[in-house]
Curated annotation (Swiss-Prot):
Location of the Kinesin motor domain: 79-404
MF GO annotations: ATP binding; microtubule binding; microtubule motor activity
Coiled coil, from the record: 35-73, 400-456
GO biological process, one term: microtubule-based movement
Name of the coding gene: KIN14U
Organism, as annotated: Arabidopsis thaliana (Mouse-ear cress)
Family statement drawn from the similarity comment of this UniProt entry: Belongs to the TRAFAC class myosin-kinesin ATPase superfamily. Kinesin family. KIN-14 subfamily.
UniProt protein name: Kinesin-like protein KIN-14U
Length: 625
């Protein structure tokens, strides 16, 4: 077999076993890329990969800058922020001529019994505020959760003021929880320097007990039957809080996360009161655990938590008319809310001791309310005149939470400096985000070019290598002697190296080695099978000749066997095996016409006196197997 190095051609020479002259066959690969084009393509891939590496470094640097700027903005505004949302009047409610509640962009004024009280907030959402507007103010804190900070979003307020609507919403107007989950997946999909995974858990705190809302055992059972699941609050050496026994599911997309969220909502404890027909009688806590890992080798996984909490409604027993178990539920809710207020107030005042152990709610949120955490509380109030007492109680709670960090406590000059600093940071944030967006677009474009170039390179060069390996065995190799040695892997490697188009980083891939090994095994197996068939035929012919009882036949057979040996000794060619006649004409015609396996078929002898019966052949063949 000859290989043309100029055009990548394989020439098949004339077979030595064929009696007729065979015209040499030429196989030409039309898909071969010229060497200079292959080298140019390889160089282009290398340059593009270097550009991808540089773009990722720039993107990582800008992302770190964005994280720092965002953290400064949130800290300047306050790591614990309090918003207020005023519920609109319902269609069944009578709207008074003079409303008791008036509000501005960051304050609420309550008028009652000839007096007025003013409460300040970081932001006030009016009655006409939409779900999208509320989420717009919450969205930046979600980015902090992806950046590695623990984040806590709480909905607080009197029963019937719209806490559950703000957190859950409806199918037409989704609430904060579904919007936040969707935003997390959107942000994670655009992060080209980190891989992000999410796990989800839901539980409720009912009268001081923990209930797993995503457990497979949850159904329409009574709480006493379903509360047997053991959930224990534990704190590790680093201060991270874990709940032993709590179900945690990995969510791969928003659809699956929304399904689990709806499942947990359906088994939450609710009850009828004078104020609300479906009053929440517990605190519902949804936890999204975020695992963020860099693409660089040796990067560590950052773990952060996002808590979205729909707190039970604060209420006065005289207003709700609760008795029995409903009254006990209300008391338990009020006690845990009071403990939460104490913790937030202590954190805002930066006290040395924070009373986390006063309730299960604050124990669970210990690592999400303290240092490096971001807290956002949404206080809900009613505009009705009948609810003024409960409204004042809710706003007084938030006043404790905001503590001494009221903007009114600052002088006009300090207030202007604070606003100017926030404005400058927000401008820097926009510039950084715009830079990240441009780099991401360019990075995506370059990665597409790299993939296209690599695909072209593999299609052309790898196909040529496969053709060489396949054509290394000539289509007429089966006509050669059975002792011919197949082409070894060393020769194939030399063929590859001599072609000159294989790039340095593809000279020894796993795929090529596997194809090499499989090809060699097939060639060796084919040669071995041909040798075994030839050996069996030799033994078969010998056994037939020895079984003949006629001495004359033995002499004729001996002469017919020794003559080729003498001729072979004189000419230097190997002897031919003894041949016999077979009476089955159809089998004889089939064997004579079969040119693909000349060594495995049985041919006739020129001496008619040494013919054997077909039954003898069958009997001897069965004994060989």
């Amino acid at each position: 077999m000859l290989i043309s190095a100029e055009k990548g051609e394989i020439l098949i020479p004339q077979s030595p076993l064929s009696s007729e002259s065979v015209v040499p066959l030429v196989y030409t690969d039309v898909n071969v890329v010229p060497e200079h084009e292959s080298n140019q393509l390889e160089k282009s891939i290398s340059n593009l990969e270097e550009e991808v590496f540089e773009l990722k470094l720039k993107l990582k640097s800008l992302d770190e800058k964005r994280k720092q700027v965002l953290n400064k903005i949130i800290d300047t505004k306050g790591s614990i922020r309090v918003f207020c949302r005023v519920r609109p009047f319902l269609l069944t409610e009578r709207r008074p001529i003079r409303e008791p509640v008036s509000f501005g962009p960051d304050n609420v004024v309550i008028r009652s019994a000839g007096s007025s009280k003013e409460f300040e907030f970081d932001k006030v959402f009016h009655q006409s505020a939409t779900q999208e507007e509320v989420f717009g103010e919450v969205k930046p804190i979600l980015r902090s959760a992806l950046d590695g900070h623990n984040v806590c979003v709480l909905a607080y307020g009197q029963t019937g003021t719209g806490k559950t609507f703000t957190m859950d919403g409806t199918s037409e107007q989704p609430g904060l929880a579904p919007r936040a989950i969707k935003e997390l997946f959107n942000e994670a999909s655009m992060d080209q320097t980190h891989s992000v995974t999410f796990r989800m858990s839901m539980l409720e705190i009912y009268m001081g007990n923990l209930k797993d809302l995503l457990s497979a055992r949850q159904s329409l059972k009574s709480y006493e039957a379903s509360a047997k699941c053991n959930l224990n609050i534990q704190v590790d050496s680093k201060g991270s809080v874990e709940i032993e026994g709590l179900t945690e599911v990995e969510v791969m997309d928003f659809t699956k996360a929304r399904w689990w969220y709806n499942k947990g909502r359906r088994v939450r404890s609710t009850s009828w009161t004078n104020v609300n027909e479906t009053s929440s009688r517990s605190h519902c806590l949804t936890r999204i655990t975020i695992f963020r890992r860099g693409d660089a080798v040796g990067s560590k996984t950052e773990v952060s938590k996002l808590w979205m909490i729909d707190l039970g409604g604060s209420e006065r027993l005289l207003k709700t008319g609760a008795i029995g178990q409903t009254m006990d539920e209300g008391r338990a809710i009020n006690l845990s809310l009071s403990a939460l207020g104490d913790v937030i107030a202590a954190l805002r005042r930066k006290k040395g001791h924070v009373p986390y152990r006063n309730s299960k709610l604050t124990q669970i949120l210990k690592d999400s309310l303290g240092t490096r955490s971001k807290v956002l509380m949404l206080v809900h109030i009613s505009p009705r005149d009948e609810d003024v007492g409960e409204t004042i109680c809710s706003l007084s709670f938030t006043k404790r939470a905001r503590a001494v960090e009221s903007n009114r406590g600052l002088t006009a000059e300090l207030q202007k400096l604070r606003e100017k600093k926030i404005s400058e940071l927000e401008e820097e944030m926009e510039e950084t985000q715009e830079g990240c967006k441009k780099i991401k677009a360019r990075l995506q474009e370059v990665e597409c070019l790299v993939n296209e170039h690599k695909k072209l390179f593999w299609i052309t060069n790898d196909k040529y290598l496969e053709d060489i390996e396949k054509k290394a065995i000539s289509p007429l190799d089966h006509l050669k002697d059975t002792d011919a040695t197949p082409i070894s892997s060393d020769k194939l490697v030399k063929i590859r190296k001599s072609s000159g188009f294989v790039p340095r980083f593809m000279t020894s891939t796993v795929a090529s080695r596997q194809r090499q090994t499989m090809s060699e095994k097939e060639i060796n197996a084919k040669a071995q099978s041909i040798r075994s068939v030839a050996k069996n035929l030799t033994q078969f012919s010998t056994s037939q000749s020895l079984s003949l009882s006629d001495s004359r036949s033995k002499a004729l057979l001996r002469r017919s066997y020794t003559k080729p040996l003498q001729a072979a000794a004189n000419s230097g060619t190997p002897p031919e095996t003894p041949k016999r006649h077979i009476k089955d004409n159809s089998l004889q015609r089939k064997n004579m016409n079969d040119t693909s396996s000349p060594r495995s078929k049985m041919v006739t002898s020129s001496d008619p006196n040494v013919r054997a019966k077909l039954c003898h052949h069958k009997r001897r063949m069965s004994s060989l197997t």
